[in-house]
């Protein structure tokens, strides 16, 4: 895990492997504690690259963009 303090919050970068995909997560936390997340991953079965966006306060992806 990599964590960096910014002027208006913090950013945390972690890697993950959930069995279906592996990639990284970038989590931004503002000074009020609100979090937003972008995950960049590759599906293991198809090799499809994705960007998954979670808006502040959302547990489910708000958008999934296929990159290839």
Predicted regions and their residues:
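Short intrinsically disordered terminal tails
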Residues: 1-2, 66-68
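Negatively charged, low-complexity tracts enriched in Asp/Glu with abundant Ser/Thr
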Residues: 2-14, 19
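Residue-level signal for functionally critical sites in structured catalytic/ligand-binding pockets
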Residues: 12, 40, 67
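Acidic, low-complexity, intrinsically disordered interaction modules
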Residues: 16-61
């Amino acid at each position: 895990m990599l964590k960096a303090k910014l002027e208006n919050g913090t950013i945390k970068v972690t890697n993950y492997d959930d069995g279906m995909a592996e990639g990284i997560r970038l989590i931004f936390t503002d000074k009020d504690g609100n979090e937003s997340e972008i995950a960049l991953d590759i599906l293991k079965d198809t090799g499809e690259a994705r960007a998954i966006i979670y808006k502040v306060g959302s547990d489910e992806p708000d958008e999934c963009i296929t990159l290839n």
